[in-house]
C-alpha cells in the first residue's frame, strides 16, 4: 500500500539537507546514506548517492526515471549465487 498523498513523499531530513547544500554550491560529491526508505526527489537528479545494502555502500547515480522510487530499490541486499551444482561425488552415489 502506498503512502497517503496528503502526507507527501518521505525523504530523510539529513539526506535532504546534504543534497540542498550540494545544489547551492554546484558540487557533485558521493553522499553516503543508510536511509533506503527515502523517496528519490527531483532535486536529487544528477547526484551519486551511496546506499547501504547491509554490507557495503552501493553507489547509485540518480536519473530522471528514478524520481518517485525508493533508494533501496537500486541497492539489492541479497546476492544470488545460483542453485547447487552436481559434483562428481553426488553423481557417483546414484
Curated annotation (Swiss-Prot):
One term under GO cellular component: small ribosomal subunit
One GO term under biological process is: ribosomal small subunit assembly
By its UniProt entry, which Pfam families does this protein fall under?
A: Ribosomal_S19
Q: Which InterPro entries match?
A: Ribosomal_uS19, Ribosomal_uS19_bac-type, Ribosomal_uS19_CS, Ribosomal_uS19_SF
Q: Which UniProt keywords apply?
A: Ribonucleoprotein, Ribosomal protein, RNA-binding, rRNA-binding
From which domain of life does this come?
A: Bacteria
- Asked whether the keyword RNA-binding is assigned, the reply is yes
Looking at the UniProt entry, the stretches that span the membrane are none
Q: Which GO terms describe its molecular function?
A: rRNA binding; structural constituent of ribosome
Report the sequence similarity comment from the record.
Answer: Belongs to the universal ribosomal protein uS19 family.
As for what it does, the entry says: Protein S19 forms a complex with S13 that binds strongly to the 16S ribosomal RNA.
Instruction: Return the protein name.
Output: Small ribosomal subunit protein uS19
Species of the source: Caldicellulosiruptor saccharolyticus (strain ATCC 43494 / DSM 8903 / Tp8T 6331)
Amino acid at each position: 500500500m502506498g503512502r497517503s498523498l496528503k502526507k507527501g513523499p518521505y525523504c530523510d531530513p539529513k539526506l535532504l539537507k546534504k543534497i540542498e547544500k550540494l545544489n547551492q554550491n554546484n558540487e557533485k560529491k558521493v553522499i553516503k546514506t543508510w536511509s533506503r526508505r527515502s523517496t528519490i526527489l527531483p532535486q536529487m537528479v544528477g547526484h551519486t548517492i551511496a546506499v547501504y545494502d547491509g554490507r557495503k555502500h552501493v553507489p547509485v547515480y540518480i536519473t530522471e526515471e528514478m524520481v518517485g522510487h525508493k533508494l533501496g530499490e537500486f541497492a539489492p541486499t541479497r546476492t544470488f549465487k545460483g542453485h547447487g551444482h552436481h559434483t562428481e561425488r553426488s553423481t557417483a552415489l546414484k
